[in-house]
Amino acid sequence: MRLIRVLTAVLVLVAGCAPGHGLPPLPPVATTTGYRLGPGDVVRIITFGEESLTGEFRVNDSGRVALPLLGSVRATGLTPAQLESAIGTALKRANLLRNPAVSIEVTTYRPIFVLGEVNKPGEYSYQPGMTLVAAAAVAGGFTYRAIQSYASVMRTVNGESIEAKASRQSFLQPGDVVTIYERRF
């Protein structure tokens, strides 16, 4: 009986030492319509009836999109719909178009980073709907030492970097940094 108590206490102590154990759960992912643009995203901007204002543009490191005739427009933190509105307003103010019709589509998202116990850690392209386990698969799969049931995800939310515990089915966002932990034994 005493041996069982001692073994139980040892198991509880060892389980409490697991990496990432004290992290809060990952907050829910924003929907596609709520997606916020950031540096590294590439957007296709279509200004109907204006070839010169149509094309693919990258959100630069300062969070802006450089457009012909308009110059640079702030994009970081905006949804694609908000950027459509901002460009439309800028076109009106510059007296370039009276009733601009602007459409925006994200063509390339910011990359994700997969670190730790995967076969090929590194930077990978994000695909909408990507889960933690899909990211591990893209990174060559889990190593034999990996904890496969959860991982740590570092994400920027409202300009603040947070780290949280994520399950295999947790959805990722562009720019996430995923760390797959090593099993203790």
What are these regions (language model features)?
Residues M1-A15:
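Sec-dependent bacterial lipoprotein signal peptides
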